Amino acid sequence: MTSSGKVRIYELSKDLGLENKDVLDAAEKLSIAARSHSSSISETEAGKIRTLLKQGGSPVASAPAKPAPGKAILSVRKASSPAAPSMPSKPAAPAAAKPSPKPSAPSRPEAPLPLIVQKPVSRQAAPQKPVSRQSTPAAAAPAAAPSAPAPSAPTPRPKPTAPKASAPAPTASAPSAPPRPTSARPTPAPARPTGTSPVKRPGSEASSPRPTAPPTRPQPKAPVNRGAPARPAPKPELVGRPQPKRAAPGAPVRQIGQRPGVSPRPSGPPGQRANMPQRPAGSQRPGAPTRPGNAPSKPGQPRSGASSLELVGKPIRRDGSNDGAGGRSDGQGRPPGAPRPGAPRPGGMPGMRKPVAPGELMQLQKPNSRPSAPPPRRVDGTPVATRSGEAAAGGAKATPPVSRPTATPPAAPRRPGFRPGPGAGGQRRPGRPDWDDSAKLEALRSKSPQKQRQKVHIIGENDDALTAETGGFAGERQAMVLSASLARPSKPRTKHKPAPKPVAAIRKRRKETARQRQRRRAMELRAAREAKQVRPEMIVVPEDNLTVQELADMLSIESSEIIKSLFFKGVIATVTQTLDMPTIEAVAQEFGVPVLQDDVEEAAKKTVEMIEEKDHAHLIRRPPVVTVMGHVDHGKTSLLDAIRQARVAAGEAGGITQHIGAYQVEIQHNDSPQRLTFLDTPGHEAFTAMRARGTKVTDVAVLVVAADDGVRPQTLEAISHARAAEVPVVVAINKIDKEGASPDRVKQELSEQNLLAEDWGGDVVMVPVSALRGENIDKLLEMILLVTEVEDLQANPDRLAKGTVIEAHLDKAKGPVATLLVQNGTLRTGDVLAAGPVLGKVRAMVDDGGGRLKEAGPSCAVEALGFSEVPTAGDEFEVYPDEKSARAVVGDRASDARASRLAQQMASRRVSLTAMSGQAKEGELKELNLILKADVQGSVEAILGSLEQLPKDEVQVRVLLSAPGEVTETDVDLAAASGAVIVGFNTSMASGAKRAADANSVDVRDYDVIYKLLEDIQLAMEGLLEPELVEESLGEAEVRAVFTIGKSAVAGCYVTTGKLQRNCKVRVRRGKEIVFAGDLDSLRRNKDDVKDVATGFECGIGCDRFANWKDGDIVEGYKLVTQRRKLAT
């Protein structure tokens, strides 16, 4: 109970031991406003609900569901008969389903028992008299003896052959009905059964079949009920209103709560009406649903007044009042779920019905008397049986009598009678108008055009003549004769033509199927092709550009996928459009394929042949050059340390190699000393060019793979370099001593790259080693020498030297220093050489151990001093006989180098017009100016390449100067003038540079690990971006009451999630629409201003600029927080 003395629904349900839904249903029935289980109601209302639930049990079981306004509610109730207390509780359909001997009549397999549709209220009514419930028209014996007579043998009914062409009428049971001449009408039975002597009900199986209307039908014998006088076979006649709630067995039952009102008249022909059961042309199949509302009379069968249900009582109102005289109590012995044979089954479509006043329920009753001589009439929905004997009543058709079952099976329950209602004789209560002509017109439209049109009078469900025991026969005397032109006979013909429509559809489907077959085959072929295509591990891009189609072919995907990917990135591309390198990398990265530039692979190819023809006569064997490659942290330098017995890896910054290291090792092989030259390449992804240069000059590539990590991206790149240089590969599986090492897994992954181990049947040497413990190092060296012996490595030491610049840097004491690998000839001190556009004269040479050398033969790696400037790493050098010839070559190369360098600088500053305009709209073009100084040329290349990969959509990186060497005072002056940041990598500051930087407030950063350098540059770029505001959700509340205070309004809310804070941002959501967004100006709880309200508490919310609160509104609270922006990738 709340503090205000109210009770919540869930508390009440807990007290009563019921579900919340049951209590809510009871509250809804009592018109108590309760939205959910947490709604509050007063103690008085709670008491009403307790009383209702204690008296009637669960609302679901005690009361029908509350109807929508203007709809009647039907409830199915078990009827218990005082006259038949021993009636079984289960449905008696199996017992009642036994047909009388009727050989030719088709029977329905399952005939449900009649359905009593009524409101469960006590009725002040006279005792009802039971009559025989037969769905077949029984005119021969309106009154039956209490004992079941033996049925006479019926004449077999021939199967109808002529189909009907009429559409079903909404208020009639069949399109055509035989007319009933007055001369053929029998008089009512002199004595009717009383409520204590019920007549046994014949099996519904015999009356359920609905054959199609035959043009002629033989006259069957009419069975005579024992105890009733034999009478001539009368014509079928209407003994009650056409009842929308009754249909033949097998008809769909209207669900409880369905509106029994008049359905709107369909605009199209009957054959095209949606949501209406379509009857085949002429006949009703056994088991096929009949339109609810059709009369249950069968073709060719006389109708008995004692065997048909009628609406003879006034509709029962929900308030329990019973104005009419008809009413059947709940105690008539029918099982609760057993439907009556004439009731429509659930799921069926209701037919055309008349509107029912809100709160009314229909009641089915039987008449207790029949009019003596009603005028001829026609029951809608009964097929015409014969055309013989129609002389009476002006040529109207007469239905011959048929054999009717007179006895029920022994197990069939006795049906109690019904009480006669007042107004017997078919007198209509004065003051009630006839039903509208639309129903009559619809009934007339459904008639077959071949049949003679009859006078049709449609009696609605709610007509006051429901109180009449005859069900409105008296109203027929005022029936309106409709014009024949209103029948529109052409519409029913469409029901005969359902066949052409499927034919046309089939034809259309065949055409579509052919196209779909072609599409399906194309899709299957494409899917098979895609299944066969394996996505490559890496793609090589030639000339830094590809078209969309070429990229799709390389990635083994559809070009449309690439176009879609580019579209989501804001790039509109076609199949033939050329993509630049950054776009190609972005697309390939999305599909998980790394990209290798073709120029990098070209750098790994041996483009210059070091041995000329004149050298062939002087060739001798040279030591092999071995390049150690692999992924970062896989143990390359540690392996070289183990070979050289040195400790290089321990002294490297960050524990990673960032330069090419050249070492010479002398080992014993076959009792003779052998020399090996090792090049240690960096494994970081930024040093791709360095690895390519190392592979270009190598003779054997040693691929180091960690046994606990397997094949990684740089491993794949190293394999690509080795294949481009066409050098043999020796795999060293390192770290076999670590826990989790799996050499076999490494071999399996390498086999997927077409590197198959020798012990697996391949030709690739794979040696498991441990660099830290020194395991299998000798075996690895032996395998390297065996591989190089096969290669037959030779050179001419008696000529001028030729080779490659492995690395270059600027030493503040020594000047420009280059690491040279002599590949042919002998390099001596004092030689003049040209390394690309750089001229140099060798002043000194130093080996890897720091010792001075006078000369260096083939496969020797040395550091040379004496260059005019720092040469470019990767350039070939050649010694010339004199300085003049060397200067001529260098001059030509310098002009070319200058042009390419200018192009690179322009490319680094290039900004597209689209990007400039977009940034100009934001108010400022954001740029980060850098001056890059590094220790060696290779490091400058690596850093520039990594900077190119940073996203530049929002911030441009401009490298004003990049060179190896120290940071000088000139660099500081340039940075101060341009607002640049000086980035140094493994270098120092010259004298005066530090003082100049402090004086000009220039930011100078020095790094020794490339990871940290790139990370700080990216953070600096993000620092130029404006911070963004992000919504942070606080909570939600539901408006449950609105209070008006002056001109403003306050919403009484219940906080469902999170919490609400004063002065936070709120959105008011009504359904799916946001009706207000602004600030929460007032937040109160129990008339006290509070800062916040947590979940589960009620509060009052006020907004100065919003007062249109409504119950059920959702208030979302949030706040805006600033967040550092990231670079868009």
Curated annotation (Swiss-Prot):
UniProt-listed PROSITE patterns: G_TR_2, IF2
Binding site for GTP: 630-637, 680-684, 734-737
Domain of life: Bacteria
Ranges for region G1: 630-637
Gene Ontology MF terms: GTP binding; GTPase activity; translation initiation factor activity
Keywords: Cytoplasm, GTP-binding, Initiation factor, Nucleotide-binding, Protein biosynthesis
Region entry Disordered, spans: 33-462, 485-515
Record's compositionally biased regions (Low complexity): 33-42, 56-99, 135-147, 162-175, 257-273
Alphabetical list of HAMAP family matching this protein: IF_2_B
The species this protein was found in: Synechococcus sp. (strain CC9311)
Listed InterPro entries: EF-G-like_DII, IF2_II, IF2_N, P-loop_NTPase, Small_GTP-bd, T_Tr_GTP-bd_dom, TF_IF2_bacterial-like, TIF_IF2
Pro residues composition-biased segments: 100-112, 148-161, 176-191, 211-221
GO cellular component, one term: cytosol
Localization terms from the record: Cytoplasm
Residue ranges of the region described as G3: 680-683
Basic residues bias locations: 490-499, 506-515
Segments for region (G4): 734-737
Region (G2) location: 655-659
Protein task: One of the essential components for the initiation of protein synthesis. Protects formylmethionyl-tRNA from spontaneous hydrolysis and promotes its binding to the 30S ribosomal subunits. Also involved in the hydrolysis of GTP during the formation of the 70S ribosomal complex.
Residue ranges of the region described as G5: 770-772
Domain annotation tr-type G: ranges: 621-793
Basic and acidic residues bias spans: 431-445
Protein name: Translation initiation factor IF-2
Family: Belongs to the TRAFAC class translation factor GTPase superfamily. Classic translation factor GTPase family. IF-2 subfamily.
